[in-house]
């Protein structure tokens, strides 16, 4: 009998012993940098001429690893391997499938700091963000394995005299997993494990910016006893390999986390029935957000300022849940802005080699250029409060940047920037605050800072987001506690880490037997 699920605790880096342990892990990981990682198709290692080089965004001359790059030929091999493995894996008992995932979780937990240290190197994550990413990866494994054991029981339906009816779940087939680079361990692991534990097989195309952690995770699954072909590792370009895999007639399910642009493209392509295709493809998508922290007129200023700061600048604002918009009542507007400015200017932006660094780099040159362009837009649309500076000499560093006095329809208030840029907008009433909070095409997360119970109840009904928080930041969803997924153009509201998520990877089957 399994123990009840409880989320993996975060590491307290104020404790000297924890800091030393993490420093040792960083040293150990640094010694392994520069290794090469082949494709994995049907358990076979395949090296290709074309390669993807993963670099440390905090230190551009440091190569984290080199990964073989798949083309259409390798993508085809991966799909065929997954399709073949599906014919046996689908009949493997839920208990056996879950046991593989439990073993992988236990192994990762034993090497938790090493995995987190790799995230520091490959994505430039500060220690606490890397630690939370690894903890969430473990949580996904532990939670989904338990959920599968429950789902295996089926759901009760009525039976009549002389008739026995069952309602059970069966897997769908080959699943294409396209995870993002920002939660390079947690989301990659969660979206890979969910189809596996439900009896599907996987073709994993990791983010090109962060493929090394995915290669390591595939190794971990193999060591836990996952059979050949159940997961196939094929890094490659979205335009070539991604489109090919989305279009493939044997692809049954696509799970994607990334931009609105790519997500809608996947939806469009997946809807077209290809020659030889015998099913309608499902798409599970999370496509970003433009998330708002609303501050009511009776709010605690210190609480509001800290919630806004944390929401906006955790992991350099590179979260789909990042609170990049602060909508503040005019009575507290100036006070809140000033306090956010004070907090922001005490934080360190640097290579996250110590626990004292609050913010590291952005992920790559393209992101750096995009974000700095938005900062220039912000200077035209609003008032620069603090930040606005950047340096890509050694790494891709942008200081946390705050703009005030933005119009609700301005670009900084409407477009997902995915960087450390925060926009403030002033409102004169709670009605207006809700109107502004809902005025984007996204609906992922949001927060309301208020002591007004009537306003809380109104926001529960009228603030149209998938994850709504009160009197706290709008980031940091925990598996099993805050199932995650959004409305509108934020995606399919699939609620990762929730009780309904695994069923999206399966088909319900009704069985009726007469006696």
Curated annotation (Swiss-Prot):
One BP term from GO = proline catabolic process to glutamate
Pathway-wise, it operates in:
Amino-acid degradation; L-proline degradation into L-glutamate; L-glutamate from L-proline: step 2/2
**Taxonomic superkingdom:** Bacteria
Q: Which organism is it from?
A: Bacillus pumilus (strain SAFR-032)
Which UniProt keywords are present, listed alphabetically?
Answer: NAD, Oxidoreductase
Reactions that this protein is recorded to catalyse: L-glutamate 5-semialdehyde + NAD(+) + H2O = L-glutamate + NADH + 2 H(+)
Please name the HAMAP family in this protein's record: RocA
The identity of this protein, by name, is 1-pyrroline-5-carboxylate dehydrogenase
State the EC number(s): 1.2.1.88
Report the active site residues: 286, 320
Is Iron tagged as a keyword?
Answer: no
InterPro entries, per the entry: Ald_DH/histidinol_DH (IPR016161), Ald_DH_C (IPR016163), Ald_DH_CS_CYS (IPR016160), Ald_DH_CS_GLU (IPR029510), Ald_DH_N (IPR016162), Aldehyde_DH_dom (IPR015590), Proline_metab_enzyme (IPR050485), RocA (IPR005932)
In alphabetical order, the GO MF annotations are:
1-pyrroline-5-carboxylate dehydrogenase activity
UniProt enzyme class: oxidoreductase
* Cellular-component GO terms for this entry: cytoplasmic side of plasma membrane
**Protein family membership:** Belongs to the aldehyde dehydrogenase family. RocA subfamily.
**Transmembrane helix: present as a keyword of the record?**
no
């Amino acid at each position: 009998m399994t123990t009840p699920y409880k989320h993996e605790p975060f590491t307290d880096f104020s404790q000297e012993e924890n800091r030393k342990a993490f420093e040792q892990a960083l040293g150990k990981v640094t010694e392994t940098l520069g290794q090469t990682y082949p494709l994995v198709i049907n358990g076979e290692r395949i090296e290709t001429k074309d390669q993807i080089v993963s670099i440390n965004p905090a230190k551009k001359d440091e190569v984290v690893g080199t990964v073989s790059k798949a083309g259409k030929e390798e993508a085809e091999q991966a799909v065929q391997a997954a399709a073949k493995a599906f014919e046996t894996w689908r009949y493997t008992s839920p208990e056996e499938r879950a046991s593989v995932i439990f073993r992988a979780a236990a192994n990762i937990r034993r090497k938790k700091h090493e995995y987190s240290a790799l995230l520091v190197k490959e994505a430039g994550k500060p220690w606490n963000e890397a630690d939370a990413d690894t903890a969430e990866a473990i949580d996904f494994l532990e939670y989904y394995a338990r959920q599968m054991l429950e789902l295996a029981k089926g759901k009760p339906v009525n039976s009549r005299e002389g008739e026995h009816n069952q309602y059970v779940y069966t897997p769908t087939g080959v699943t294409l997993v396209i995870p993002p680079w920002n939660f390079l361990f947690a989301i990659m692991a969660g979206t890979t494990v969910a189809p596996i534990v439900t009896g599907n097989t996987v073709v994993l195309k990791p983010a090109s910016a962060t493929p090394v952690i995915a290669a390591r995770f595939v190794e971990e699954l193999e060591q836990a006893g996952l059979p050949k072909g159940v997961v196939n590792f094929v890094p490659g370009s979205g335009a070539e390999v991604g489109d090919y895999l989305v279009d493939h007639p044997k692809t049954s399910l696509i799970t994607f986390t990334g931009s609105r642009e790519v997500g809608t493209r996947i939806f469009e392509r997946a809807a077209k029935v290809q020659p030889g295709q015998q099913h309608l493809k499902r798409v599970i998508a999370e496509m970003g957000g433009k998330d708002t922290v609303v501050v009511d007129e009776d709010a605690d200023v210190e609480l509001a300022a800290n919630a806004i700061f944390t929401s906006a600048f955790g992991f350099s604002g590179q979260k789909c849940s990042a609170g990049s918009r602060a909508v503040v009542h005019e009575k507290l507007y100036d006070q809140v802005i000033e306090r956010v400015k004070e907090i922001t200017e005490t934080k360190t932006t640097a290579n996250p080699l110590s626990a004292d660094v609050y913010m590291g780099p952005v992920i790559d040159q393209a992101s750096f250029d995009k974000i700095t362009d938005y900062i220039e837009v912000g200077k035209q649309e609003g008032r620069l409060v603090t930040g606005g500076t950047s340096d890509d000499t050694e790494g891709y560093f942008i200081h946390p940047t705050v703009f005030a006095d933005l119009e609700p329809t301005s670009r900084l208030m409407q477009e997902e920037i995915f960087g450390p840029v925060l926009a403030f907008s002033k409102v004169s009433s709670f009605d207006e605050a809700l109107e502004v909070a809902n005025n984007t095409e996204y609906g992922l997360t949001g927060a309301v800072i208020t002591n007004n119970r009537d306003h809380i109840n109104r926001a529960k009904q009228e603030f149209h987001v998938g994850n709504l928080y009160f009197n706290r930041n709008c980031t940091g969803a925990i598996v099993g506690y805050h199932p995650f997924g959004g409305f509108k153009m934020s995606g399919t509201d699939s609620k990762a880490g929730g009780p309904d998520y695994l069923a999206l990877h399966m088909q319900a089957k009704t069985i009726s037997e007469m006696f």
